[in-house]
Amino acid sequence: MKKTFSFWVVFLWCSVFVHANELRPDGLIFNDYPGSTVLVIDKSACRLMVYKFQESWKMHRVFPCTTGKVNGDKFREGDLKTPIGIYWLNQAWAGWELAQYYGNGANVYGTGAFEVSYPNYFDQVIERKNGDGIWIHGTVKGDPIPTRGCISISNYNFLELTRSVELGATPVIIEEKVTFSPSAVIAQEQQFLMGTIESWKRAWESNDVDNYLSFYSSNFLTEKWNFNSWQAHKKSVSTQNKRRRILLNDLSVLMSKNIYHVRFVQTYTSSSINDVGFKHLFLVKEADGLKIISENWTPLNQLSPSPAFQYAYKESQQNSM
């Protein structure tokens, strides 16, 4: 089934009242596609929760876990902390693959590992974090023990977890303490966010550059641009390329530390440019509404050729919003 943006905006209105009283993590704003899985890790409670969506979000499994030896958010390599934020699982290793690479040192990872996409773009550009090698992995034997920053579960539970994970398509929400709200409350936030994204897209597509730039924070920052240089760049582009079509597919909206992480497949078509890739928007609530504080776009042909990425590319070539 095509996962188009406009279809799910309508779907949200229909689903709000059906499951209004069900509780779910506050960070799980929207990834409402049948069969979708989101992993939610509560560091303080030492548990990894597996949420699955059919008609609504349900907690499918809960696994005891351990995290870094030191509490708090990760900022530096070697600080022994587990990062807090929104991440994706992009690579996996079986135990024998780890043994080939690490030798006897691989025993600590148990039966296998998933790579967590730390540091993500927001971590690097806005929060200036460093370090890497954060995994969800098994354990030597028995129950997991505190780690150098990874998330560890028992080997049996790791094998169970592999049944739910799709590389490139399964997000991970990591929090010090997970909070929950009724689905009806989160649905209101969904509508507000979806409306903002739709208005941003329309302003961009219609070449209304002043309206388009109004969606950006004065603190906007990427690896290449700050707000002033971005504003000048976009005004220049708008005079050269006045007609464009923008399609958004496979949208997800997740939240951590009051930052909304929006990800979608973006297909951009104009008289001079035709491209498709993953766009990430990072939004924050400011006094005058939601604002984009950073964004990043990656061409699909530069990403891992995992089944999830290939599927997203194929889907983006079909009709959408």
Where are these regions (language model features)?
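Gly/Pro-biased beta-strand-loop elements
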Residues: 23-133, 308
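Positively charged n-region of N-terminal signal peptides that target proteins for export
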Residues: 1-4
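Surface-exposed, charged secondary-structure patches
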Residues: 81, 107, 233-280
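Short, solvent-exposed aromatic-acidic interface loops
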Residues: 64-71, 136, 267-268, 294-305
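Short, well-ordered alpha-helical segments enriched in acidic and aromatic residues
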Residues: 206-219
